[in-house]
C-alpha cells in the first residue's frame, strides 16, 4: 500500500470517528477498537460490540501528552511521577492517572481515575494527530475470544461493516502494561 492510499484510508477512518462510529486499528501488539472519547453514543456502541461492562472503565490512547490533559488531573502528579510517565512514552505502558472531575463516567467507569497511553505505533500516532484528540482503546475481540492481530481476524469477529484502518500491529506479543501513576503499582504485566 502506498502513502497516498494509506492517507485515503486514514481520511475514511477519521470521517467515521466524526460520525460517532466505532473503528478498528493496529496498535503495538493487537488490533484495537476505538471511538471518540467525547461521544457517549460511540462509547456505548463500543461497549456493546465488545460486550464489556461500563464499570470497568476504558483506556485512552493519544499521539502526545497534550491530547490527554483535558481528561486527566495533571496537578495530582508530582515532578518525579510526571518524569516517570514521560520516560516510558511514547511506548507500550498505560498509566492510570486521577481523572478531571468533568471527565465523563462512560470513560472512567466506577473509578475516579483514567487509564491513558501515548502510543509509539506510527498509525496510532498518525490517526490521533489527524483526528486531533485521543481515542478510546480496547483490544479488538469479543468476550471470550483472543484479541485480533490481523485485519482478517477483525473482519471474522466483527463483520465487514466495521471500519478498519489498514496496517500491521507492532512487534509486541502482550498488550500494554498498566501501572498506577501515583503509586507505581502494576495492574497488568506487559
From Swiss-Prot:
Domain of life: Bacteria
Keyword Transferase: yes
Its EC number(s): 2.7.7.87
Compartments in which it is found: Cytoplasm
GO molecular function: ATP binding; double-stranded RNA binding; L-threonylcarbamoyladenylate synthase; nucleotidyltransferase activity; tRNA binding
Keyword annotations of the record: ATP-binding, Cytoplasm, Nucleotide-binding, Nucleotidyltransferase, Transferase, tRNA processing
4Fe-4S keyword on record: no
Major place of residence: cytoplasm
A Gene Ontology biological process term: regulation of translational fidelity
Every YrdC-like domain range: 7-190
Catalyzed reactions: L-threonine + hydrogencarbonate + ATP = L-threonylcarbamoyladenylate + diphosphate + H2O
Gene Ontology CC terms, in alphabetical order: cytoplasm
Protein role: Required for the formation of a threonylcarbamoyl group on adenosine at position 37 (t(6)A37) in tRNAs that read codons beginning with adenine. Catalyzes the conversion of L-threonine, HCO(3)(-)/CO(2) and ATP to give threonylcarbamoyl-AMP (TC-AMP) as the acyladenylate intermediate, with the release of diphosphate.
Family as reported in the entry's similarity comment: Belongs to the SUA5 family. TsaC subfamily.
Name of the featured protein: Threonylcarbamoyl-AMP synthase
Species whose genome carries this gene: Yersinia pestis
GN (gene name): tsaC
